[in-house]
Amino acid sequence: MIAMKNILIYFDYPITSIQGGTEQASFLLARLLVRQGFRIIFLSLHPFKEKNNEFPQYSLPDSEYLFSRRNADFTEKLCDEQNINFILNEGAASDSSFFFSHAHLNTKATIVSIINFSIWEGLDHFLSLIPPSGNTWPAKLKTAARVVSAPWKKYMAIRKKKAKLNHLLEYSDKVVVLSQKYIQDCLFLTSTRNAHKLYAIPNLLTFQIPESLSPGTKQNILLYVGRLSYADKRVDRLLSVWKKLQPVHTDWSLYIVGDGEYRENLEKISEEYHLKRIFFMGHQNPEPFYKKSKIVCLTSTHEGMPMVVNEALAYGCIPVVFDSFHAAKEMIPDTETGRLVPAFNLKQYTKTLDGLMKERYRRPNFKVLDKYKEEIITRKWLHVLKNGNE
């Protein structure tokens, strides 16, 4: 057990236990570290609407512009007054990495930058990031122009990514990524001079694995859980697949659990495709849906290490995922665990689902979840936090 040390955990949005994604992962990490004797405080750019009684919460005074002098002064004073030993920046994939750096902040605290996404963030599938402009001729010409300019834009985006990663590694004390694969990606895009600063730690399991799971509780449900956005999640692909499957599998349904800026577009696509037995459930606790679903679907352009895959396995759902991010094979190593489909091959994705829907349901192998257990994640984090920035 480490002697009491103080940790500030930052994310742009307030860290809570009821949100998904990075917010939930950060909250679970905070609880883990408290159990190891650390004291935790939260800091966010945007003000919190509801206080939690578990951790002290602070928000930056200037929510409109992170890089204001007021925010820097506030952060430095907070670190000094609270005797902060470590700053954990959970938003290091964003531009906050330039703020929480020794180039910007005057602090003795050890800065640990945490990248909760893939390193490439879809740049290796650049054309898939370009949304179509529409079906009219002017819109099609606009889309064509975007495609023509894509190689140059990709080159510039990768150049910017390299510069950002180099800055991150230079001015952070330590950098945590989700997978050993992402350490390799970092070193491919940057020099190896700061390789010693890189650590691979996946997120904790968000649910306890049920000891027993009756197949009788499972229904003929395909499930999507997550944010409804275009560039990364591409749920429109799943709707295209469902369009082909629904006439064949009339006793199956598709549930979409989540919300986001692309929801309205998806609902319009659903109407255009005349989709049946599709339910947009909005933002809800996904646990009841995992319990009754047989298959969880991901058709993303890029992911980090999506918690939805581990959550699905914990509740006996078979994950069917595009092999579009470099940690995919680590999460789904074999067909006993789930199904990996070649990236963006909708025909193969449809065929894979069709086969599973025709087969008798069998609970997938969840042995892979052992690597996300608390004792393993704890050991990895204690190694990162052991010696500060020594």
Role assignments for model-derived ranges:
Residues 11-20, 26-28, 32-70, 182:
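N-terminal strand-loop element at the rim of the active site
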Residues 89-95, 115:
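Short His-centered aromatic/hydrophobic patch
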Residues 264-283:
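Nucleotide-activated donor-binding/catalytic signature segment of Leloir-type glycosyltransferases, i.e.
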